[in-house]
């Protein structure tokens, strides 16, 4: 069995594209081999900033022999038909077989093909993969018509120790490559993957991104510990830097003290966004005046010149940040509000100033429902977007809200207002903390609900995988705010209030928006609770009742329904419900009528139907009492008492009695089972 080694050596591949590219290369070549019937033991791909590598082990020297049969014309067919068949198969009449198929005697061609050499297939598949490679962005270079993410320098392609002459544009594969751009740029020849890996290491290249990541993290943590500090965790930055270096060398640098009065978030964001530096923290969690840079160089002076150069660049960056910070604080947030009228929120939904007016009013509405101070909530919402016109947020949009908090405190606003400004975008994802302070919750809800109502009202709803306005995230944020804070919030009422704050002519009515949004929340709630093992069909079964817009109450009902269905009584009653519903549906269709209302007690002949009617009456009262107190577990327990009388009814009573009045009465009794159970959930939506 043989090995295939492929290296595509180019200018620097953007870090964000590397992992996907390695997966795509492995997948495309593997699929191409499979289509040609060539199997192998393992395929692994690697990527560095300058090289995309694939190694496939356990390959045969040739593909399998193939035997193919083609049926031709009848033996009695004219010569013209025979000529076409012979031409398509490349055979003579003497080489054909004659077979009686039962429908006549036909010619058959049995074509035996030797398996193609694997090297030939590898060349074809590799060139095809490169020609159709799905880079998010690619370019042409020189006089070439081909495209690649960055100009290709060389291609290395070896199969069983021999060169596979892969050609792509001006590059034709050989057995040569080069090491680190600065530390070992000389070309060298390789024999196989083991030789390649060893020589790359000697040439200052760590091929495996997992190894580079580990080296960066371990080195950075070691330097931090030596300073008595901790490395600020940042998986995104770690992944990006891993894709920027082939030979990582962590170094520690210093931040000038004059910058340390700038908010830590600004310093961290500036270092991360512009310089790809890791921040270091003191034992109390505050930012230390140190940073870690990952160099791609080993130097004779131990990195002193590299550190000095990076500190010089950082001073310029942080000088800009400090200037923005000082400049922004000279103008109060409230004075910035008129500028929001110059910013469009969305063409059909007005300006950011319009949105601020709406969320301020809505935050006041919500505050009264959740026990927050209405005036404080309205004030916080009024200032929540003001930092969008500041210099720092213009430079670092990810700091919006957070900088508003700093500026609000600088202006003398209360901590409650400042905290609500900072938190009003939260939670932005499953890893983001959820606001708990009542005012912060009111403003965060108002901001998200306003967006959902507006976009749904103009039919800009998420479709499939497309969600350009992050409305799914907004809905999940609302769900978390409500559930994690235990808010008894009537969402329908809030949606109608939000619709009323829009001055624009919206396409859909408030009622349509409320209905669409409640269904949207049901779908998002199912997604949010899936990780907790809550079945989506149970959520649908409760929502389908209609009128349930209290998410806390809905969750209690779902939990009670789940526990009920997990019980023996619940599982068996569900079977009986389906049986009853099926019978009623069939008979209603047959009679062209609806069996509703109460069964006539005077027409109950058998003990089992009398017992069922009595049980339905008792259970109905018990369910009513439980629903008043929202004791849904008790309501389900009451429902469970129907199991035995329902089972006895089906065992002993003939529903389709010969006497028409008895038949109708018994069908009404079955319909009453559905009605009784339907007060707690739409059991027709329950799966399984």
From Swiss-Prot:
Subunit field text: Tetramer of two alpha and two beta subunits.
Signal peptide: none
Localization annotation: Cytoplasm
Protein name: Glycine--tRNA ligase beta subunit
GO MF: arginine-tRNA ligase activity; ATP binding; glycine-tRNA ligase activity
GO terms, biological process: arginyl-tRNA aminoacylation; glycyl-tRNA aminoacylation
Family of the protein in this entry: Belongs to the class-II aminoacyl-tRNA synthetase family.
High-level lineage: Bacteria, Pseudomonadati, Pseudomonadota, Alphaproteobacteria, Rhodospirillales
InterPro entries with a match to the protein in the record: DALR_anticod-bd (IPR008909), Gly-tRNA-synth_bsu (IPR015944), Gly-tRNA-synth_heterodimer (IPR006194)
Keywords per UniProt: Aminoacyl-tRNA synthetase, ATP-binding, Cytoplasm, Ligase, Nucleotide-binding, Protein biosynthesis
Segments crossing the lipid bilayer: none
Pfam families assigned: DALR_1, tRNA_synt_2f
EC number: 6.1.1.14
Catalytic activity: tRNA(Gly) + glycine + ATP = glycyl-tRNA(Gly) + AMP + diphosphate
GO cellular component: cytosol
